[in-house]
């Protein structure tokens, strides 16, 4: 499948001109883009989308909600001209051995979502002052999907770019906890309860350690019976010795 990139460019230009009529931006595909490898002055933007693939060998088709899209953006302030380099990451067929990475194809709705999110990123990064900020449009499943993401046949996963392939690095605290911590909700959030319990446990452990250290290092308050017996025997021995010498 081949992306109709001419249509993408036209849609991108319409969205940019609607927001910034005097700005000039170009959008180009670049299959050599690498994550975190940017020239000076460039910025990076990554998103995922719902797309379709077709195997060029067996003609099998499949859908994925983990199609990764990497963009590098640059804007020249004095000329008000900007550039976008975009890379679409492919997937391989599960059924064919030695299959190649196939490029994704997107529905018109998914295409609009991808480009709208890209334009919002540009407006936020380069035209932040006085620009109405909109949240990123989420991925919408066009069909029901079964099973987990096929990381073994995902090009982005093999390159360490796909979020599904880097769960340990991408994990963040749930946003649902933030309102409880910021607004002072009457019922404490999970994060607040966790922090309170953690502080309480640390305080208890400190007290226990301090108490145990005092018992080991400090002097004993109770007299030792053995020492008393030795003292009495020594006293008796001295008295007997005195009488014997007389």
Curated annotation (Swiss-Prot):
Function as written in the Swiss-Prot or TrEMBL entry: Chaperone protein that facilitates the trafficking and functional cell surface expression of some G-protein coupled receptors (GPCRs). Promotes functional expression of the bitter taste receptor TAS2R16. Also promotes functional expression of the opioid receptor heterodimer OPRD1-OPRM1. In addition, acts as a potent IFN-inducible suppressor of pathogens including lyssavirus rabies, influenza A or yellow fever virus. Mechanistically, associates with the viral replicase, binds viral RNA, and thereby suppresses viral genome amplification that replicates at the endoplasmic reticulum.
Assembly with partners or alone: Interacts with TASR16. Interacts with OPRD1 and OPRM1; the interaction promotes cell surface localization of the OPDR1-OPRM1 heterodimer.
Database matches in InterPro entries: R-trans_p (IPR026096), ZAR1/RTP1-5-like_Znf-3CxxC (IPR027377)
Tissue spec. comment: Expressed in circumvallate papillae and testis.
Effect after changing residue 93 to A: Loss of interaction with influenza virus NS1
Cytoplasmic side: 1-224
Protein name: Receptor-transporting protein 4
Keywords: Cytoplasm, Membrane, Metal-binding, Transmembrane, Transmembrane helix, Zinc, Zinc-finger
The keyword Transmembrane is assigned to this record: yes
Transmembrane segments: 225-245
Residue spans, zinc finger 3CxxC-type: 48-159
Membrane topology (UniProt): Single-pass type III membrane protein
């Amino acid at each position: 499948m081949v992306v109709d990139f001419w249509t993408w460019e036209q849609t991108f230009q319409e969205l940019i001109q609607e927001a910034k009529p005097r700005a000039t931006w170009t959008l180009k595909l670049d299959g050599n883009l690498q994550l975190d490898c940017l020239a000076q002055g460039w910025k990076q933007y990554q998103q995922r989308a719902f797309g379709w693939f077709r195997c060029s060998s067996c003609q099998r088709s499949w859908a994925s909600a983990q199609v990764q899209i990497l963009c590098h953006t640059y804007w020249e302030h004095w000329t008000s001209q900007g550039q976008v380099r975009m890379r679409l990451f492919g997937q391989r067929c599960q059924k064919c051995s030695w299959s190649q990475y196939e490029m994704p194809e997107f529905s018109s709705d998914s295409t609009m979502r991808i480009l709208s999110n890209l334009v919002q990123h540009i407006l936020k990064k380069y035209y932040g002052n006085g620009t109405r900020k909109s949240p990123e449009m989420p991925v919408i499943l066009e069909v029901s999907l079964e099973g987990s993401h096929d990381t073994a046949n995902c090009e982005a996963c093999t390159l360490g770019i796909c979020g599904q392939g880097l769960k340990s690095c991408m994990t963040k605290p749930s946003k649902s906890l933030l309102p409880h911590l910021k607004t002072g909700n009457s019922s404490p959030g999970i994060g607040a309860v966790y922090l309170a319990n953690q502080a309480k446990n640390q305080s208890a452990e400190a007290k226990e350690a301090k108490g145990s250290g005092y018992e080991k290092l400090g002097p004993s308050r109770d007299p030792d019976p053995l020492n008393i017996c030795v003292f009495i025997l020594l006293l008796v021995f001295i008295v007997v010795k005195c009488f014997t010498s007389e």
